[in-house]
Regions:
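Active-site loop segments of alpha/beta catalytic cores
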Residues: 1-38, 42-47, 57, 68-72, ...
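Conserved FAD-binding subdomain of flavin-dependent enzymes
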Residues: 54
Length: 356
């Protein structure tokens, strides 16, 4: 089939959204590391271990499927367990889609006493992340700084199961870990800002451990929300103005508190799991760009027609968002997604995603 001719470049399309103007069509963007690598005949591990190959795989895959890489997602810069000395390995079998944690740096209360904020230039896999950021800068893309929320980074340091127990029995330990996580995130972000300048950086945060599948809204407000407030105070002090937030999983019960706190500059890019209705998301955040949220399981396991139909529904809802919409999956695009289902997404945007 022949697709309609774009009337804007990706840069023009995203610039329009961030200036509260309608673009020619709904942009497509994906949170993904493994899929582009598999798409060009490489392993998922390549996405985490070879910045040049990953970058080229993403560029070619984006062109193939009409994705808009303003901004481009990339592997995490800050990793809670790995950065603090935890064990890990690269994904090996076809069903492993990310780094695999083999041990946590904090196993007991006493381990927290010995925990030190890492050197931002040397810890974990930060060197590889810097290589990728320099490739983004070289090719005229925003430099995407990817971290999880302080709550999620802290949970990654000791493991979510242990962190959840401490929330109930020793909440002061969780507070200590979150303060350490916050300092580490911003030490590394300062390194990025010193290297590229605040105007070039697009700060991305995900918050998977804050899902209501894990914690209650009361726990969210007590433990996680204060660190979102502090995060944005520090982000503002660095002069970073572009923010992308993946509110991962089922966080329907957290949305009122997030909306009420009014934390980030507007418009920001707010991504939602498939569990959140896009029209409801737009009601909570009318001044931000809504991003999402075709169910990833259906993209991997469903038929092209099912994916096409779900994408159409997302487009119809997203078009109603007062400050704009970006079409994506509801979380990371599964590495084993059939290529034809990505074509189905592009076809649905071509058929229904234009602003006339």
């Amino acid at each position: 089939m022949r697709f309609k001719q774009d009337r804007m470049s990706s840069q023009e399309r995203m610039d329009a959204l961030f200036n509260y103007r309608k673009p020619d069509r709904i942009p497509i963007n994906m949170i993904t590391v493994g899929f582009p690598c598999r798409n060009v005949g490489q392993t998922v591990a390549t996405g985490y271990d070879d910045p040049e190959k990953y970058f080229q795989a993403m560029i070619w895959t984006a062109e193939q499927y009409g994705w808009d890489l303003i901004p481009e997602i990339c592997p995490h810069v800050v990793l809670g367990s790995v950065d603090f000395g935890g064990g890990f390995r690269l994904p090996e079998c076809e069903f492993e889609g990310a780094l695999v944690i083999t041990s946590f740096p904090v196993k007991t209360e006493g381990d927290i006493d010995n925990l030190r904020v890492p050197d931002p230039k040397k810890s974990g896999r930060i060197g590889k992340a810097m290589e990728l950021s320099k490739l983004q800068e070289k090719h005229g893309l925003p430099v995407t700084f990817v971290s999880r929320s302080p709550f999620s980074v802290a949970a990654n340091i000791c493991g979510l199961e242990q962190f959840s127990k401490w929330m109930l029995k020793k909440p002061e330990l969780c507070e200590r870990l979150m303060m350490i996580a916050m300092d580490h995130i911003f030490n590394v972000l300062q390194y990025w800002t010193d290297t590229f300048g605040a105007d070039q950086i697009f700060a991305f945060m995900s918050s998977p451990c804050e899902s209501n599948q894990v914690i209650s809204p009361r726990q969210f407000e007590k433990f996680a929300l204060p660190y979102h407030v502090e995060y944005h105070k520090r982000l503002k002090s660095l002069g970073i103005k572009r923010f992308w937030f993946h509110i991962c999983g089922d966080q329907n019960l957290n949305l009122p508190a997030l909306a009420g706190a009014s934390l980030w500059p507007h418009p920001s890019l707010l991504s939602f799991g498939h569990e959140v209705d896009l029209e409801e998301a737009a009601k909570f955040f009318p001044h931000d760009i809504i991003y999402g949220n075709v169910e990833p399981t259906v993209i991997q396991m469903g038929t092209p027609q099912q994916v096409y139909d779900l994408t159409k529904i997302a487009i119809e809802k997203g078009k109603k968002a007062p400050s704009g919409f970006v079409l994506s999956a509801g979380c990371e695009l599964p590495p084993l997604s059939p290529p034809v289902n990505l074509f189905a997404i592009a076809k649905a945007v071509n058929d229904f995603g234009w602003y006339e």
